[in-house]
Design a protein with these regions (language model features):
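Amide-donor transfer/coupling interface in amidating biosynthetic enzymes
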Residues: 1-74, 89, 93-95, 99, ...
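Short, glycine/charged-enriched secondary-structure capping and boundary segments
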Residues: 53-55, 84, 117-120, 153-156, ...
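Cysteine-nucleophile active-site neighborhood
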Residues: 105-174
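Short, Asp-centered acidic motifs that coordinate Mg2+ and/or phosphate
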Residues: 102
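N-terminal beta-loop-helix "entrance" segment that forms/cooperates
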Residues: 73-86
Length: 305
């Protein structure tokens, strides 16, 4: 089954060019199926890009999925047209009385700030607490993962001496978990961050399980509450050219910008990036949807608790 997306969402036309089948709301209403309801709290500056990246991954499942986009009342985006936000996004207050089968919390370019100094931190905390009783399984990404680990479990973040930037090999530590079904022994994950969470801090917290990590980039996936929460420190959702755009953007601002590791062919930025993470990204999201959302959520969505 395809994704059900709001009519006129830009991602629809972009993904049709990639031969991904999506369905707008008007057509989806003709199918008498209870779709899975996934809400995305999109904190990234380039919201349309992030929408497309996530919708692309959510499309690789036979299940019908209805996607909602949540915005913060305490923050006004500067890089996305207000008309787009008004048409496709709803405030937390509008969505808080509803329940969802799954939720995705994206990263945000604020990782060097203390959490309490972030203008929308109180609203984020409220949303995180709400998700525990209104969502079957929540996927926290990059800064979202760090923020979730800090809010729920007190896990601190630590500054890195150098930006973690590139594609890094990850090892699944418990291949028997459904989230890793079909995975190879190693898988690649894009990373782009200035801070980290550390194994020694996570190991102090009962109920947190490190399920994937890298000898070079550290902890990559943490699971909690039997899969009702996943914290992913990298960006499996990134498009092939995302790190290239970040590299060239930063190069235009200063001269001491390192190449993203393990990304360009022969480490030559004039060459095309090597896409080594796409298959596992699709598998990760499909496994999350199938084993931790679809198979765990009640048929009557109001029974989620």
């Amino acid at each position: 089954m395809p994704l059900r997306l709001p009519d006129k969402l830009p991602a629809i036309e972009l993904l049709k060019h990639e031969n991904i089948f999506v369905m707008d709301e008007s057509r989806a209403h003709s199918q008498e199926i209870r779709p899975l309801r996934i809400v995305v709290l999109n904190l990234m500056p380039l919201k349309i890009t992030t929408e497309t990246d996530l919708v692309r991954l959510l499309s690789h499942t036979p299940l019908q999925i209805e996607v909602y986009f949540m915005k913060l009342k305490s923050h006004t985006p500067k890089n996305t047209p207000i008309e787009h936000m008004m048409m496709f996004y709803k405030d937390f207050a509008e969505l808080s009385k509803q329940k969802f089968d799954g939720m995705i919390v994206t990263g945000a370019p604020i990782e060097t700030m203390q959490y309490e100094d972030v203008e929308y931190w109180p609203e984020i905390q409220q949303i995180f607490d709400w998700a525990r009783t209104h969502v079957t399984s929540t996927l926290y990404i990059c800064w979202g993962a760090q923020a979730g680990l800090y809010h729920f479990y007190g896990v601190p973040k630590h500054p890195l001496s150098k930006k973690m930037f590139g594609i890094f090999r990850q090892k699944s530590l418990d291949p028997s978990l459904p989230i890793f079904r079909g995975f190879d022994d190693w898988f690649a994950m894009p990373q782009s961050r200035h801070t980290e969470v550390r194994r020694e801090d996570i190991e102090k917290v009962p109920g947190l399980d490190i399920i994937a990590e890298s000898p070079e980039s550290g902890v990559s996936i943490v699971m909690a509450r039997g899969g009702r929460e996943f914290f992913v420190t990298g960006h499996l959702e990134y498009a092939p050219d995302t790190l290239d755009k970040e590299y060239r953007r930063d190069l235009g601002k200063r001269d001491d910008v390192d190449l993203p590791k393990n990304y360009y062919y022969h480490d030559d930025p004039t060459e095309e990036p090597l896409v080594t993470w796409r298959a596992h990204a699709n598998l990760f999201y499909s496994n999350w949807i199938n084993y931790y959302v679809y198979q765990e959520t009640p048929y009557n969505i109001d029974d989620i608790k």
